């Protein structure tokens, strides 16, 4: 997902837990699966293959978890009146915020308009009726970017694994997305620090 992650959990002795190394191995495996499915920073991931290697009107088979996240993205697009749109990838990349090379100069109005023509939740179809879900573009150049919710999905995956082990005190963070339960080592609620943004004169936000 092109970001960092941190996991803390407390072994309170109430249940027999696997060794820390085994827990780490399982957590890494779960994250790898999410990356293999939904990371635009990984060239061979499912989402990268869909973005770069499929033509318009060509169904592309995806995993159930990938489909679940896309389905949620479609729902969120509706309830936010389009504020959350996972098809903004072409614009994200144009401005240098995606896995593509960084921005060297401000894009022209023509470039922005061209990329914007590829954006829209109505420009792809998710079909979950078959044995395996499929995604189909209606326009060549459509680029899905699930970074707005895929990290949260990954956080939930890791938290669910910890709870399956019987761990009731944990804090999971992936790229700023958090899920916590219980208390820290001092038996106090987890405290989350939020960095105050600063802006140097002459910089743009």
Regions found by a protein language model. Give the residues of each.
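Mature catalytic core of soluble alpha/beta enzymes
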Residues: 1-205
């Amino acid at each position: 997902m092109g970001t960092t992650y941190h996991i803390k959990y407390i072994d309170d002795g109430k249940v027999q837990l696997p060794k820390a190394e085994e827990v780490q191995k399982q957590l890494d495996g779960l994250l790898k699966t999410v990356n293999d499915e939904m990371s635009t920073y990984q060239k061979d991931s499912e989402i990268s293959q869909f973005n770069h290697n499929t033509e318009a009107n060509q169904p592309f088979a995806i995993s159930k978890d990938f489909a679940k996240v896309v389905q949620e993205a479609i729902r969120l697009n509706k309830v936010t009146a389009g504020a959350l749109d996972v098809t903004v990838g072409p614009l994200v990349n144009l401005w240098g915020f995606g896995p593509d090379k960084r921005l060297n100069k401000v894009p022209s109005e023509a470039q922005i308009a061209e990329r914007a023509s590829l954006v829209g939740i109505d420009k792809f179809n998710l079909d979950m009726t078959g044995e395996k879900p499929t995604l189909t573009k209606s326009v060549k150049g459509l680029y899905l970017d699930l970074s707005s919710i895929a990290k949260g999905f990954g956080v939930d995956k890791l938290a669910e694994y910890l709870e399956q082990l019987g761990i009731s005190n944990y804090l999971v963070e992936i790229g700023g997305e958090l899920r916590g339960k219980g208390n820290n080592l001092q038996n106090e609620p987890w405290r989350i620090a939020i960095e105050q943004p600063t802006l140097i004169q002459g910089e743009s936000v």
